[in-house]
Amino acid sequence: MSWQQRVDDALTARRATDTLRRRYVVSQGAGRWLVANGRQYLNFSSNDYLGLSQHPQIIRAWQQAAIRFGVGSGGSGHISGYSVAHQALEEELAQWLGYPRALLFISGFAANQAVITALMKKNDRIVADRLSHASLLEAANLSPAQLRRFIHNDTQHLSRLLQSPCVGQQLVVTEGVYSMDGDSAPLAEIQHIARRHHAWLLVDDAHGIGVTGDEGRGTCWQRGVKPELLVVTFGKGFGVSGAAVLCSESVADYLLQFARHLVYSTSMPPAQAQALSASLAVIRSDEGGERREKLAALVQRFRAGVNASRFTLLNAHSAIQPLIVGDNSRALRLAEALRQQGCWAMAIRPPTVPVGTARLRLTLTQAHEACDIDRLLEVLHGTGE
């Protein structure tokens, strides 16, 4: 088979199963409204859960820091790219979340890949929730360690997998809030099982940090859990981008030596780090608390209004509210029907989610108003799908 034939066959297979992804060009993609092709839509596809991407205080912090530092970091943090802005943000994050150290990464994908590939060796075992993010599962597959996956949130299955003999070390991998289902992991029980088997725990709290817990400290804090490795990302609740790994002093020193995604990548711009510090200040403030309360009320309003006889609503109380429709083509038709009525939502299909669980992944944000939720419900229940 030629290279071109391989490419063509893969695309043809995606088209045949209604799983071909496409991008949409937007003029504005975060916040209450999405603007595309000159039309304005109520935006139910953004991860900007607290509406902070448009916050004037955070925008101003980025602008002022760009004037001071320039628009790029100029290099890896191991060379010349680790600024006082990066250092300050790491210290603020560590203090806020109660860890000795925090290390910044350019993305959550990079952070997850870096930690797993740096730590895991031959004869080790990774035991990951079956619905873990692609960055976690890909890193596990690429590492020399054995990968075993436990049934989603099934702690008995997790325990059985950890009980089987392992010559090396074991790492349990889970998420705080799951990106496609919107539900939460039983973190306290998972941590208890991991410790019983002398395994370390890695929690990716991309969708919980900033949004849940006291001062927005996330799902782990809310559940009284402190994993050995906590990954937080900044493209959701923080409204910016990037990520950090919270860990012990020695693990941080180890990652600085062996995490190739950290060593060989240009650091995030110092202006971005400054904006993240400003975002953290808002998250921890009374205003941040008010934003979280408003978001929680909007989620409750939506869940109370969904017609359960037409849509399968998962046990999700986060900003992520998936409506399971099953069939790929139906999910695409439903998303298009919503767009025709001025509501922007995306159809999520395999391989992102399991076969037969195609869905509308609706995300609610603090930027929405109650009338926006009512309009979404009206459109959903008025469609023929």
Curated annotation (Swiss-Prot):
Substrate binds at R21, H133, T352. The keyword Transferase applies. This is 8-amino-7-oxononanoate synthase. The keyword Membrane does not apply. It catalyses: 6-carboxyhexanoyl-[ACP] + L-alanine + H(+) = (8S)-8-amino-7-oxononanoate + holo-[ACP] + CO2. It comes from Salmonella agona (strain SL483). Pathway: Cofactor biosynthesis; biotin biosynthesis. The lineage of its organism: Bacteria, Pseudomonadati, Pseudomonadota, Gammaproteobacteria, Enterobacterales. Pyridoxal 5'-phosphate binds at G108, F109, S179, H207, T233. It is an enzyme of class 2 (transferase). Its cofactor is pyridoxal 5'-phosphate. Keywords: Biotin biosynthesis, Pyridoxal phosphate, Transferase. Homodimer. GO terms for biological process: biotin biosynthetic process. Catalyzes the decarboxylative condensation of pimeloyl-[acyl-carrier protein] and L-alanine to produce 8-amino-7-oxononanoate (AON), [acyl-carrier protein], and carbon dioxide. The modification N6-(pyridoxal phosphate)lysine is found at K236. One of its GO terms (molecular function) is pyridoxal phosphate binding. Signal peptide: none annotated. CDD domains: KBL_like. InterPro entries: Aminotrans_II_pyridoxalP_BS, Aminotransferase_I/II_large, AON_synthase_class-II, AONS_Archaea/Proteobacteria, AONS_Proteobacteria, PyrdxlP-dep_Trfase, PyrdxlP-dep_Trfase_major, PyrdxlP-dep_Trfase_small. It comes from the Bacteria. It holds the Pfam family Aminotran_1_2. Belongs to the class-II pyridoxal-phosphate-dependent aminotransferase family. BioF subfamily.
